[in-house]
Amino acid sequence: MNWHVAKRMGVVLAVALLAACKDDGGDGGGPDGGTTTASAGPGTGTSKAQPEGTPFTLPAGITLETPLKSFYVEDPRDCDDKDRDDAKGSGGAVTLCLIFRNTTGGPITVTLPPGLIIVSKDGSIQNGLLAQRVSIEVPPGERYFTPLFLYCANQDRATSGVGDEYALGPIIGYEGFQELYTLLEGKQLTRQAVTPIQLAITHLTNGEGLSDSDRAALKAL
């Protein structure tokens, strides 16, 4: 693999994602010069609270090494040399390496649902949101590595850096989110799709809801 080309592509994507995540339609200031709260619910937008939703559990026989950690996608030696071509999910504001163990004698499929939020252990780093359902077949035996790409859920926080720690959160279904999941269901997404999706998610997580242009862009993917 040409890591120089991959790195340049990764930088371009990261810049586009950051711009989309930061597109909050204003400067974040209140009328007195202070900050305003822009959030669809706990753990999204500017909220520092723990996300609320349906608990997520792994299938019997599957364990996941914790804490979950982000990794450097362009040099993925910390994720068993699996890169963006091996990744599940889309996005890129939060890039995690999941390490599973299957303690049974046969393969197990792990399904991660849309709306699953991965919670940063550092309040200055973004939580990550899964926008589409993904399935991961985990073979029996030793550690099985899977990169997972997620969208920015907090427009006022930094993107994930190497070694940032995360934990599995609940499946969130705040107002308007189910419409997003439905619009994206079953779509085969390209890297070019990431920016309009992130922009729509930023509108949702800030409590603004999807705009007509968001809906049109998502339907066109």
Question: What residue ranges belong to the model's regions?
Answer:
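Intrinsically disordered, low-complexity Pro/Gly/Ser/Thr-rich segments with frequent PxxP/GP/PP motifs
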Residues: 119-168
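Terminal connector regions
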Residues: 26-29, 147-200, 205-218
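Bacterial signal peptide processing site
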Residues: 22-24
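Asparagine-centered strand-capping/turn motif at beta-strand->loop junctions
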Residues: 98-107, 112
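C-terminal motif of bacterial Sec signal peptides marking the signal peptidase cleavage site
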Residues: 17-20
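Bacterial N-terminal signal peptides that target proteins for export
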Residues: 1-10
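Short, solvent-exposed loop/turn segments enriched in Ser/Thr/Gly
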Residues: 91-98
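Low-complexity, acidic Ser/Thr/Pro/Gly-rich terminal tails and inter-domain linkers that flank the onset
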Residues: 28-89
